Amino acid sequence: MAQTDRRATGDGLLEKLVGVRRVAKVVKGGRQFGFSALTVVGDGKGRVGFGRGKAREVPVAIQKAMENARKNMISVPLEGDTLQHPITARHGAAKVHMQPASEGTGIIAGGAMRAVFEVVGVHNVLAKCIGSANPVNVVQATVKGLVQMSSPEAIAAKRGKNLEEIVGGG
């Protein structure tokens, strides 16, 4: 589950630590221990990125993960403070289903998905993780789903039609 480390940095980005794991490398003389960190970074207005960092010490691993997350930021078209439409995405064995929710619903999502929604600026969403609950795969599937989401205006422009033809101006 994501830790509640929601820090606003000097550049206006929200950082969230999803998890830290201790990993071991077996060598001739025994085991060498290190740490792996997974973080998500966002501006709360539709930009999000995730990163992984590995190091011998926890703070260094977290710092590397934050830097990677800042480098890999993408923009997400939001509908106010929720999603444009329901979407399902998968990465590996992790499958996530996300759908928009009405005002006042809140973020109904588990651990790693919740962290992504909090930093991207989504305040009302219903989400479910199906299959693997591995935080790395869940975060990647969530971000993949957010990237696939597009606004009705973008779909209309892509198809060369007007908005009423797409949404059924009815």
Swiss-Prot record:
The keyword NAD does not apply. Residues 13-76 form the S5 DRBM domain. One of its GO terms (biological process) is translation. PROSITE patterns: RIBOSOMAL_S5, S5_DSRBD. InterPro entries: Ribosomal_Su5_D2-typ_SF, Ribosomal_uS5, Ribosomal_uS5_bac-type, Ribosomal_uS5_C, Ribosomal_uS5_N, Ribosomal_uS5_N_CS, Ribsml_uS5_D2-typ_fold_subgr. The keyword rRNA-binding applies. GO terms for cellular component: small ribosomal subunit. GO terms for molecular function: rRNA binding; structural constituent of ribosome. Keywords: Ribonucleoprotein, Ribosomal protein, RNA-binding, rRNA-binding. Part of the 30S ribosomal subunit. Contacts proteins S4 and S8. Belongs to the universal ribosomal protein uS5 family. With S4 and S12 plays an important role in translational accuracy. Located at the back of the 30S subunit body where it stabilizes the conformation of the head with respect to the body. The N-terminal domain interacts with the head of the 30S subunit; the C-terminal domain interacts with the body and contacts protein S4. The interaction surface between S4 and S5 is involved in control of translational fidelity. This is Small ribosomal subunit protein uS5. It comes from Nitrosococcus oceani (strain ATCC 19707 / BCRC 17464 / JCM 30415 / NCIMB 11848 / C-107).
